[in-house]
Amino acid sequence: MKEKFLLRNVYNEKMITDLADRIINVYSRFEKSGFIEFVLSDFQDLNFGERALKITSGLEKYLPQDYLEAIDILTKSLGPELSSEPGLTIWEGFYIMPVTDFAARNGLTHFNESMQFLYESTKRFSSESAIRPFILKYPKKSISLLKTWATDKNVHVRRLVSEGTRPRLPLGIRLPIFQKKPEMILELLDLLKDDSELYVRRSVANNLNDISKHNPKVVINILKEWQKEKTKYFAWIANHSLRTLLKKGDKQALSLLGFKNPEMKNCKLTISNSKYRIGDNLEFSLEFISIKKQKLMIDYAIHYVKANGKLSKKVFNFIKM
């Protein structure tokens, strides 16, 4: 039987050895064996985040204590730039994550040098998590710099502008300043909304979806502006950025996509059975008569009992027509 893949195993002895080799190639005094031994001690018992932190701690222990010297070494040790959107199988790039965390943990008092390092590292693997402590500490300064990055020729740098400023990035610290004042990042998203790369536009939509969870009116208003401007990719971005509001049945979000108040009659929902066991298939059908020619989006919700005994639901799209 094929062994189950565990995300934590992207951090393994080979990856750590490769990282040590990259460093020693540009910094001959690096204690390779000591670094590897330190990182691998108790490694098997650690989860994904703990392994990443152990690597970062190893860098802190074995690189020069002078931050600027250390970050220069790490910059020179970076591998070749990615040529396009990274695929799901490029696990080797994960070694850069704890390297960028080194900058986030130790370089907050060196804004320019640290941000330049993150600029270079994101061309190899996203710095979306590591940039966030700098944004929290220097919000205006960071946004000013990110405006210039929004027009960078490198697609990964442009994506970082949007992904790094997401208020609710998964696996990253939240940015409450943008939850309270999302207007601060709208100019950045406006610069990226017509980006030639779907990779970037997807990030713009994800950012707007994050904002919609706290400030739905802000998202509706900016999308209305983009709609008036006849933004090239408006339909795609609107559909993806409004997904949370659409699942809530938000009337303004639905209207923005052309789903007005539906006019239907003789609606009939049929469910195959009244009782089900875990693992059974639930089949249902819906019949109705549309009174006029109109756009319709029909969702359905599955209610389930959570571990704490409370009832919750998950919304799924049934059909758009």
Language-model features: where?
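Surface-facing alpha-helical segments and adjacent helix-coil boundary elements at the starts of domains
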Residues: 1-253, 283-285, 294-297
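A generic structural signal for short, solvent-exposed coil/turn residues
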Residues: 95, 261-263, 290-292
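Contiguous segments within soluble domain cores/interaction surfaces
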Residues: 289-321
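Contiguous beta-strand segments within globular domains
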Residues: 264-270, 274-290
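Proline/serine/threonine-rich low-complexity linkers at boundaries of modular beta-sandwich domains
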Residues: 252-266
